[in-house]
Amino acid sequence: MNDDIRPAVDSDTAAVKAVTDAAYHHYIARIGVVPAPMQADHAANVAAGRVFVTGDPVHGVLVLVPEADHLYLDSISVSPEAKGTGVGRRLLEFVEERARELGLPEVRLLTNAMMWENQKLYVHFGYELVERTVTGVYDRFHYRKRV
């Protein structure tokens, strides 16, 4: 199994969608809406250089957006088959490395208030809760981590 993390290419787009959908699908019943990462334009994100993948076949996906003062972790997805194998940890470590490479002082992300597992994970990895916002049907917790 290849665990290098690399920029996604056009031929990865279907796998990016498949892994993202598999990682988030079970939340639909819990939160009552399709999670935002499942609605993303994966082809556009890949073309813009925002997507990084790991595995052959792909079993981990990151969508990263560099901003002026932080790196925004738009989404992180691990296939159900790869859960518990350290893929998520390696992806989060990569996010921090990428922020440092870009000279950005922190990583920011948000997660749905009903995604309890994610909240525990981010706190475990040193992210701090900054605020909670409600926009339409999305109730979100915002986190940051200084790197």
Predicted segments, located by residue:
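C-terminal "cap" of GNAT-fold acetyltransferases
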Residues: R50-F52, P105-F125, E131-V147
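Acetyl-CoA-dependent GNAT
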Residues: D3, P7-E81, L92-F94, R98, ...
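Conserved glycine-rich acetyl-CoA-binding loop
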Residues: S79-E93, R100-L102, A113-K120, H124
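A generic secondary-structure micro-motif detector
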Residues: I31-G32, T85, R108
